[in-house]
UniProtKB/Swiss-Prot annotation:
Transmembrane segments: none
Protein name: UPF0297 protein SPy_2114/M5005_Spy1797
InterPro entries: IreB
Family the UniProt entry places it in: Belongs to the UPF0297 family.
Secretion signal span: none
HAMAP family, alphabetized: UPF0297
Length: 89
């Protein structure tokens, strides 16, 4: 499948945004409790898609796998921009 030169729209509903945020928080705490660097592990998972970056501890691996990685990235970007004073629509 080839790429198109036209802009494609991607939309995530508000309920999913909230659930992704809660899931990332829970996964962060699980990673921290197990002695991992949570940021590095989450980035590793998001970039590679390899669930081995997230432990099974507290069901963290299954929780994060409920969402597509692009949905996780969208929520992270939204949160970052809002935290820097940008009115994200």
């Amino acid at each position: 499948m080839g790429f198109t030169d036209e802009t494609v729209r991607f939309k995530l509903d508000d309920g999913d945004k909230r659930q992704i945020s809660e899931t990332l928080t829970a996964v962060y705490h699980s990673l921290d409790e197990k002695g991992y660097n949570p940021i590095n592990q989450i980035v590793g998972y998001v970039l590679s898609g390899d669930p081995a970056y997230v432990p099974r501890y507290n069901d963290a691996r299954n929780q994060i796998r409920k969402y597509e990685r692009d949905e996780i990235v969208e929520e992270l970007v939204r949160y970052y921009l809002q935290g820097n004073g940008i009115d994200v629509k």
